[in-house]
Amino acid sequence: MSRMNTIYAVIDLGSWYIRGMVARKMEDGRVSPISFYEEPANNCIRHGCVHNIDEAAAIIRRIVNQLNENLEDNTHITSLYVGVGGQSIASQEFIVRKAMVPEGEVIRTEHIESLWAEMRGASFPDKEVLDVTDPLFYVDGKQEIQAKGVFCHELEARFQLITARRSVKQNIRIAIEERLGLRLTGILVTPLCEAQVLLSDDELTLGCCYVNIGAGCTSVSIYKNRLLAMLRVLPMGGYNVTRDLTSLRLTEQEAENMKLNHVSMINDNKSNGSFRMTFADKFSEREFRSSEVNRLAKARMDEITANYLNILRLSGLLEDIGAGIILNGGGTKINNYMAAMKKILGEVTPAKIRMDRIDTDNAISFIEEHISTIGLAYKATQPCTDYITTNLGELVSQIETKEEIPANDTVQDLFAQGRQTERKENEQRDNTDRQREDTPKQTVKKKEKTGPSFGDKLKGAFIKFGSLFDEDTNQDNNR
């Protein structure tokens, strides 16, 4: 079965939203989304992990039903990939060594396979291995990118095993297989899947720290020489800011709106003033001092920032991330957060999806909320749908029923027409070489260091962390 005929179904368990997507893949592996649907998590997901199994199953059931509506007739989702990024997820380094014959020998495929086999026997108390990254090889104590074919006396492989509490997989399995009757095709580590569709080859080669500030969690993935060097997940995110703002006698939704529309991480002229908010009833209004609101939000964002920078500091990899910090997630959308971080650290850039990972002719690919599910679909390898055949009598009955229903120009009708057109175009493309304008790749080069290094800037950030984002924070506190 070709990739374009295979449909992948993925679910991303976010603390704020649970999101689902069905997608195909182009022949070159690029993801082509078919449809996307999301629902509020309603507190059934806490810090990225399933808390209320029944509520999570009910939400996923509704998402699956909506996704099925946009599939071809008689095609239904029968299995799911589920992405997780909860607080118990972390990388564990696992080192395997193999002594060669005393006189030394050339490393062969079977030597490398024996290291993988020994790694598969690794176990951790109360933890389950969700994923394993490609290893970093050391030949006679020296790092080697391509170990096969090298003469040595000792071969070492350093794996990064991604582990989580056993209950993480158990709760997902119960929700998907027992409650919904679907097959759990695989559990994918969301931060790693996101990195595959966001980080460029240059960023991976130079080394970088990919940070996603989500609603309930903040993931920190550090890459060195194209390989994962460390993964940690913090149990805090943008939702903590929202919850702090509820202390102003606001509902969570009102606090969320305030966070997105009125909070700023840099003091400016507006910070000295005030603003008015209209509440859900559309009638009542209240006035808020910008300095008070910003002070609450800044305190929590300071804490989140301090924690992920501390993970980077403790990793010992400060001088190995030539591409700096790559920021993503809803928490980074707070006004001026990105500008504040650039002011302090310099080497900070917003994450951008790679054009060679998505179908650039598909508008759904470019919606920011889809990044996680696109990453999951990119990682997926097994088909997730089945085609249910219909006998001739049922088919005639369905056609007659459809003819009796007047056509309406609804969104679903237009979507179906669009999918039919797309299928015809894909059939035509199969017979010809598809030409595509590739976006020129901007090579990331290490800049000549004329000032403080990234590590020096980070140390400076810790020294002045009492007023991380600007020099006026202390003035705010005295008002």
Curated annotation (Swiss-Prot):
Region (Disordered): 417-458
Role this protein plays: Cell division protein that is involved in the assembly of the Z ring. May serve as a membrane anchor for the Z ring.
CC annotations in GO: cell division site; cytoplasmic side of plasma membrane
Main localization category: membrane
Organism: Porphyromonas gingivalis (strain ATCC BAA-308 / W83)
Recorded family membership: Belongs to the FtsA/MreB family.
Membrane topology: Peripheral membrane protein
Family matches, as PANTHER family: CELL DIVISION PROTEIN FTSA, CELL DIVISION PROTEIN FTSA-RELATED
The name this protein goes by in its record: Cell division protein FtsA
Basic and acidic residues: compositionally biased ranges: 420-440
UniProt cross-references to HAMAP family, sorted A to Z: FtsA (MF_02033)
Biological process annotations from GO: FtsZ-dependent cytokinesis
Compartments, as annotated in UniProt: Cell inner membrane
Subunit structure comment from the entry: Self-interacts. Interacts with FtsZ.
InterPro entries tied to this protein: ATPase_NBD (IPR043129), Cell_div_FtsA (IPR020823), FtsA/MreB (IPR050696), SHS2_FtsA (IPR003494)
